[in-house]
Amino acid sequence: MFDIGFTELIVIGIVALVVVGPERLPKVARAAGHLYGRMQRYVSTVRSDISREMQLDEMRRVGQDFKQSVESAASGVEQQASVVDDYLRGEVDMLDKSVRNEPQNAQTPPQTADAEPAQPDVRQQTLPLEEPDQNRAAGEPSSTSTRPA
């Protein structure tokens, strides 16, 4: 803090001895030591406060930068969402128009001269029906029946 060498300290001690006197010199030296300690604590407190404020300012700047980047990303996402929304609305409108026009086209199907009228499929699907087996009725076990426990 102070650049005081050994010789300068001896000169200060001799001057203090002459000015204060030998009886009061220990009390004055003790008081000067206490004042010097208080001054050092005060200086260290001020340094730590300044350091803390600088860190706080830096954190505020980082927070503001982060907030700006998040806001810009959010606005970009909102822009993309509005573009997609506009595109989807256009597609829905186009599909709506095509669905509205389709019933009109379905009411008047195109007639062709060579086209045969469509005949419904009248074939009936036959399912095989099995006659009950006489052996099963007599009590013989089959491979598909369950055995009693």
Swiss-Prot record:
Belongs to the TatB family. Keywords: Cell inner membrane, Cell membrane, Membrane, Protein transport, Translocation, Transmembrane, Transmembrane helix, Transport. Residues 92-149 are annotated as: Disordered. Part of the twin-arginine translocation (Tat) system that transports large folded proteins containing a characteristic twin-arginine motif in their signal peptide across membranes. Together with TatC, TatB is part of a receptor directly interacting with Tat signal peptides. TatB may form an oligomeric binding site that transiently accommodates folded Tat precursor proteins before their translocation. It comes from Thiobacillus denitrificans (strain ATCC 25259 / T1). One of its GO terms (biological process) is protein transport by the Tat complex. The keyword Transport applies. The Tat system comprises two distinct complexes: a TatABC complex, containing multiple copies of TatA, TatB and TatC subunits, and a separate TatA complex, containing only TatA subunits. Substrates initially bind to the TatABC complex, which probably triggers association of the separate TatA complex to form the active translocon. InterPro entries: TatA/B/E (IPR003369), TatB (IPR018448). It is a single-pass membrane protein. This is Sec-independent protein translocase protein TatB. GO terms for molecular function: protein transmembrane transporter activity. The gene is tatB. The lineage of its organism: Bacteria, Pseudomonadati, Pseudomonadota, Betaproteobacteria, Nitrosomonadales.
